């Protein structure tokens, strides 16, 4: 696996985080390379005046942030893992910290932006929210360039740039990536509420979903299956691990009203959605007793802290399909459960989580299954 990015007169050593053994994927892609080369070849830094800065949106592991270390820049991400990766790769490459501001996706953009570099995200609604925020701060002189894999740039993608920024065109493809150039036109664009709300009628819940929340348009059927098969017991400290909009943790709060529910996700928008949903749909006392944590799973949590962990594991990191996230979650759950504590998960049959749980816990049982999903229970033995 290549860790050295040699580009535009710089050599950067970049790692993906969290790090895993025998990593085969590098911490940048051809879209990063295309953006960096375009910036360098066109000497965009000469367009920066005093007190103006660069805005970077959706930098995955820090290639853009580290390359542009000499300039004042704000980096915006919805991913705790990405922000942590950027910090670690900054340290690895001895990049100065004083001219960098890292902020999450829920905050407004700075107003003194001259150059905007965007990595196209997987979720169109998230791109729209970022472009709507950008529309509020751009001027006719702002330079807006985006990059993404060819298969992620569609007419709908370009339509959003036309709507919120201005005249938009694309580059030729290189290494299966393409650039998007959008020339700002100052115009009135009606503000749109991009977060959506839908109901779970059976429970009389109204579910709020920010732009980048998993399954934001409907109730995830795997999550629904787990909600209907929660374990019976007198649980006091429960985790909804990888909580998304929080519906599994909410169901746990309804089933175990005296328990403290901890919602954990690496997406800032997910955690804020879960917080809003608890406050709107559960009794005040239960909502106030809940905890909401943006984190890389249970990393850094104390051992033997919880008696029930519920999980619908993701199998994507950025655009990469991986089972490493599930492995980490299961191992960390074993570490954080009390003796006789339970991990209950839902997953597609083909993911073969049962074998993983048996290897970690020494036991695993099928709680319920249907044609697509299986619910598994593993107990931490004394």
From Swiss-Prot:
Pfam families: MTS
GO CC list: cytoplasm
Example GO molecular function: 23S rRNA (guanine(1835)-N(2))-methyltransferase activity
InterPro entries: DNA_methylase_N6_adenine_CS, rRNA_m2G-MeTrfase_RlmG, RsmC/RlmG, SAM-dependent_MTases_sf, Small_mtfrase_dom
Principal location listed in the UniProt entry: cytoplasm
Highest taxon in the source lineage: Bacteria
Family classification: Belongs to the methyltransferase superfamily. RlmG family.
Protein name: Ribosomal RNA large subunit methyltransferase G
Originating species: Psychromonas ingrahamii (strain DSM 17664 / CCUG 51855 / 37)
């Amino acid at each position: 696996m290549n860790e050295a990015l040699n580009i535009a007169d710089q050599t950067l050593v970049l790692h993906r985080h969290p790090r895993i053994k025998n990593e085969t994927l590098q911490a940048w892609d051809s879209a990063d390379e295309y953006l960096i080369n375009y910036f360098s070849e066109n000497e965009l830094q000469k367009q920066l005046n005093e007190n103006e800065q660069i805005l970077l949106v959706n930098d995955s592991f820090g290639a853009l942030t580290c390359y542009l270390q000499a300039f004042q820049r704000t980096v915006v991400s919805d991913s705790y893992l990405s922000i942590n990766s950027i910090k670690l790769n900054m340290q690895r490459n001895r990049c100065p910290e004083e001219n960098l501001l890292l902020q999450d996706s829920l905050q407004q953009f700075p107003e003194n932006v001259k150059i905007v570099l965007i990595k196209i995200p997987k979720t169109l609604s998230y791109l729209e929210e970022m472009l709507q925020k950008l529309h509020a701060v751009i001027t006719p002189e702002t330079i807006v360039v985006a990059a993404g894999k060819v298969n992620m740039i569609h007419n709908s993608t370009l339509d959003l740039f036309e709507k919120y920024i201005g005249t938009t065109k694309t580059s030729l493809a290189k290494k299966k990536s393409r650039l998007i150039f959008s020339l700002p036109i100052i115009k009135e664009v009606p503000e749109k509420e991009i977060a959506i709300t839908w109901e779970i009628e059976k429970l009389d819940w109204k579910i709020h979903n920010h732009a980048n929340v998993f399954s934001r348009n409907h109730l995830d059927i795997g999550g629904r299956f787990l909600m209907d098969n929660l374990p019976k017991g007198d649980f006091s400290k429960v985790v909804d691990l990888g909580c998304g909009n929080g519906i599994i943790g909410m169901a746990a709060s309804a089933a175990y009203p005296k328990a403290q529910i901890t919602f954990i996700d690496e997406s800032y928008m997910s955690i804020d959605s879960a917080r809003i949903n608890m406050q709107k749909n559960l009794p005040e006392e239960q909502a106030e007793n809940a905890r909401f944590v943006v984190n890389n799973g249970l990393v850094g949590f104390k051992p033997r802290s919880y008696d029930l962990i519920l999980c619908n594991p993701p199998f994507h990191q950025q655009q990469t399909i991986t089972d490493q996230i599930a492995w980490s979650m299961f191992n960390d759950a074993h570490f954080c459960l009390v003796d006789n504590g339970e991990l209950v998960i839902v997953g597609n049959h083909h993911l073969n989580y049962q074998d993983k749980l048996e290897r970690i816990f020494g036991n695993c049982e099928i709680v319920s299954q249907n044609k697509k999903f299986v619910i598994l229970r593993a107990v931490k033995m004394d």
